[in-house]
Amino acid sequence: MAYHLWSELKASELAAAVTDATVALLPVGAIEQHGPHLPLCTDTTLAEGMALESAKRVRDATVLVLPTLSVAKSDEHLDFPGVLTLDAATLQAVILQIGKSVARSGLRRLVLLNAHGGNVPVLQVVARALRIEAGMFCVSAGWMSMGYPQGLVPESEIRDGIHGGFVETAAMLHFREDLVAMDLARDFVPQSRHVAENNQVLRLMGPVSAGWMVQDLNVDGAAGNAALATREAGQAMVEHAARRYALLIEEVSRHPLSFDAVEA
């Protein structure tokens, strides 16, 4: 069908685009350091880029792409310069109000496209709050959760390369190569790998997790092998994730809004 940028529509055009199946898509990024080789806008660039690439690939739904939420919860990066952050309660309140505003325009389906791990628990709480308080079907999913082309990303990077590593660096080479300093990229070995190798149960992240600051993972504020990244790998990852995310949006568009409909 079609996608539109919410902010570029006239009010009458937006009203005409809204049906029971229309999906609003909110990209959520961050402004925070990503090691010596990537810009502060990395997560915001990836969130916005992935939202547009995904929306373009949607075939069986109408998608309204909301303005990107650039400042989110980045307090694990506070010891580095340039970080802009909200606390969890503020971010939760902001997204809740955005969601309710979307609902007032007649939409009941919202997807939160996330590009920063620190936002995850807040977005999950908001998704349920919007179900309770606004009767919305809200889904939160990071673009990296869509997976990668078979064999492209090393298992060590999938597990530990969570910040400024191979995946994010390659994706940034695809979207904004001009902002990437590959001469400063290297293998930022994360402490989480050492912890996993030397403990049976304790982990820094995952189902068993600790409250860490980013320098607890690596003193340079990155985690993963950025030196492996290429623009070609980034393009392949982005295209794979965008296809999967477009499918998610289509499925959200078709999903019943009530349990009564599911049971029927």
Labelled PLM ranges:
Residues 1-109, 117-264:
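Extended, histidine- and acidic-residue-enriched regions that form the cofactor-binding/catalytic faces
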Residues 112:
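Conserved SAM-binding loop
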